[in-house]
Amino acid sequence: MFDLHSTDRIRAWKEFRDSLEQALDPFHEVALFWSRAPFVNQYLNIKNPQNWPDPWKLVIDGKYDDLAIALGMCYTLQLTDRFKEHKFEIHTAMLKNELRYVLIVDDAVVLNWEHRSVSQVSDLHQTIKIWSA
């Protein structure tokens, strides 16, 4: 999806979100999907969530730092019927002396902690919430 032109990218993202409605392991699918995003060093400002892009601008812009990937995972799940009523928070956490941005779903499931995998809140030592939806 990430190598497509903007309208095709939006369509492919919609098709992926639709596939999550019946997926056996939707969190793992989201982790794998966003692991293919092209990575940049810095895109979003942690201190200005009000200036973060909406879901479609994020996908169209095609720039993904660690925070943008966590936000993209959040938008992907939020825009499904299956997960639209769930609780989503983005936290900072330390992994091997590296600051990470993670998505926490329903105070239980953690995405973007480790590449291509799903973790649990119990795997995190300490986090700081920076945004919730």
Segments from the language model and where they lie:
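A structural boundary/capping signal
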Residues: 1-133
